[in-house]
UniProtKB/Swiss-Prot annotation:
This is Peptide methionine sulfoxide reductase MsrA 2. InterPro entries: Met_Sox_Rdtase_MsrA_dom, Met_Sox_Rdtase_MsrA_sf. Signal peptide: none annotated. It is an enzyme of class 1 (oxidoreductase).
Length: 177
């Protein structure tokens, strides 16, 4: 199997895993921290907003089965791409959305997707999700991995209570909500 990586941030990483897990060609989705200047940060360190990291997921995928463009289609249906100050009731640097590109193809695909979404006028405000070069990724602690499976009741309550589920459904219907 050929494999590539997509590293994407969209607020709380708990909500960024489930939409990707059953999609063909996706081999794994790992919650973690990306983009910062501290090696192997902990959740507590990242939450201080002093490490430069954002909560993110790293997706391993088979490019012969699915494309980075398909992953972006899913990604943009999981968060509010018009808010760069955090997501829903999670505010601050560690919850900012970011696309971390691994190569020029991913960079161009991300730029095109942002432009396409802005032209389609799906959102009332412009899509402003930053596109940055991939720097690093550190897996989060075990209790954060597959959170939606380990804590389904809390996961569902979090999605509803934060406003994420309502936002996604208002823009995309029940897709990925």
């Amino acid at each position: 199997m050929t494999k590539e990586y997509a590293t994407l941030a969209g607020g709380c990483f708990w909500c960024m895993v489930k939409p990707f897990t059953s999609y063909p060609g996706i081999k794994s989705v790992v919650s973690g921290y990306s983009g910062g200047h501290v090696d192997n940060p902990t959740y507590e360190q990242v939450c201080t907003n002093k490490t430069g990291h954002v909560e993110a997921v790293q997706i391993t995928f088979d490019p012969e089965v699915t494309s980075f463009e398909n992953i972006l289609d899913i990604y943009f249906k999981t968060f509010d791409p018009t808010d760069d100050q955090g997501q829903f009731f999670d505010r601050g640097e560690s919850y900012q959305p970011v696309i971390f590109y691994h190569d020029e193809h991913q960079k161009k695909a991300a730029e095109f997707k942002k432009q396409q979404l802005n032209e389609q006028g799906i959102f009332k405000k412009p899509v402003i999700t930053p596109i940055k070069p991939y720097k690093n990724f550190y897996p989060a602690e075990d209790y954060h991995q597959d959170y939606y499976k380990k804590n389904p009741v809390h996961y569902y309550q979090y999605q509803r209570g934060s406003g994420r589920k309502a936002f996604i459904e208002s823009h995309w219907g029940n897709q990925n909500a």
